[in-house]
Amino acid sequence: MSLLPNCFIEYFLPIQTPGDGNCMWHMVSRSLCGNCSLTNLLKDMTVITFFMLEQKFIEIMTIDIRANNKDANEIQLREQATQRFHRAVQVAKTPGEWGDEYHLLALTTFLATKISIYNFYHPNFSKNELLSSFRRAGERQIW
């Protein structure tokens, strides 16, 4: 049924979305209205949010790039961040392209709400049980 490790299946309920590369937007749509009908609108809103907050996103991307590239000067960092920003916009505009944390941040900003879409806790387990189980699984290196 799933390619997830058993330690995930034990604690999470898999939720199926179309396998077209838009899974993040599909999941947000499902959480808003119960189906994937808002997917394209959410992708459009992601693009609009990027453009409305372009300088802020470039600033965030610059910080991310700087963390991994200590030797780059500010001009290089800004150029790389601008390229990354334009790529993020292109991804949001293109059907079937996978979103990332920048797209999730844009959606969170637009919707003015916290988004937790990567998992859905199994109703029989508390969050503390879940976290301690993952900690134990990580110690056993079963990932």
Stretches with model-predicted labels:
Residues 1-129:
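Papain-like cysteine protease catalytic cores
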Residues 127-143:
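Active-site signature of cysteine proteases
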